[in-house]
Structures are given as C-alpha cells and as structure tokens.
Amino acid sequence: MPTAPEPPWRGRREETSRQPLTRYAIVEAALRVLDREGIGGLSMRKLAQELDVGAASLYWHVRDKEELLGLLLDRIVGEGSVPDPDPENWREQVKEMGRENRRLLQSHRDAAQISLGRIPIGPHSVPVLERNLALLRASGLPPRVIALAADMFALFVGGFAFEESMDSSEPADTDQLAEYFRSLPPEDFPTLHALADDLVAGDRDERFEFAIELLVRGLEAMADDD
C-alpha cells in the first residue's frame, strides 16, 4: 500500500543525524503507553520516560499532545486492510469496511475515544481512506453521496466503538431496564410496555450488523434510484 506525505500543517522540522529520536519512535512508544495505561495515562512526561529521554526533546518532533493523538490515530487507522473494489460485490465490501474499521478501533485501548472529533490524516491513514472511498465509489453513486456516506460510516463506527469501550452496560442492567419498562402502566406507555424485551434484546454484534445493513440498504436504494 502506498504512503502519503505528511499534511503541511503539522510543521515538522527536519531531522538530523544528531537527533536520536524520530517521529516514528515517538509514535510507537506512545502506542505502547496508550495500550498499557489508556489515554488518561498518556502524557508527554510519561512518553519521555518510556523513551528514556528528556520531555523537551519530544517537542522537536511533536508539537503537543493534541498533535500526538492525531499521529496515533493515523498510525492505528494505517493498520487497516482494504481489498480492491469489486463493483459486483460493493454492498458486502462496504459492510466489511464497517466491520474492519470497528476492529481497528477495538484493537488499541481508547482508540475509539481518540477518533472522536478527529479526521485521520497522515501518511498511514490516507492510503486507507483512498481505498475505503474506492469501495464506496464502486457502487456507482454520485460523488457527493459517496462523500456523505463515508462521513456517516465514520461517525457511526466511531460512536459505536466508543460506546463499546466504555463497557458500562452489564447484563443485569439490561434485565432491570426491561423489567422497568414492563412495569410501566400500559395505558400511559403502550409502546414502551410492548417493546420492553425487544428494546434490550441482542448483543453488540447483532446491533452493529443491523446498523450497517441499514446503511448499506439506504445506499442501495439511492443507487437504484440514480
């Protein structure tokens, strides 16, 4: 897979032979800290300790923690595997794109949280973006629809993966919630009462598959109307 140049706003300084650090080494070390301690434990000071260097030396390569998080997201998304587009099989390929992006955000601790509000742009993620867009383009949909669909998939998968990473929904909680819905007066809350069990049924995988099926069928309807 080809690499893309760094975006111009990252203000990278030229590295010289006198500098023992590289941006690559910093990002790899940051990924180790992230996996071990999460985003809350990732700081420039902790990263310097991981690399056994002074914190000030990091700023030659990385402006601040915000830029570091952007570099981490670029690195994580760059691990993605995207097939060549097949116009005859674009629907299943787009579904698999959603599954792969979910897997990527599950593969490193707090990766989903890092993805929120950030667009992965960098030498590792841009080739993945190109190939993901090519899968959507194989549908034959208009360019504007492709762009909006890509954004919608990213928003959905990122939000879904972030909710998964919180891991706050225990089985007992869903049982209690269903019991609460069933206890509501049916004359006042007929729909909640009727859907009490269905509202909490299904695991995360089932809900994820339903959502990407819904998104792809929407695109399919647009393709048929075009």
How would you describe each model-predicted region?
Residues R75-E79:
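Short, basic, alpha-helical segments at the C-terminal edge of helix-turn-helix-like DNA-binding modules
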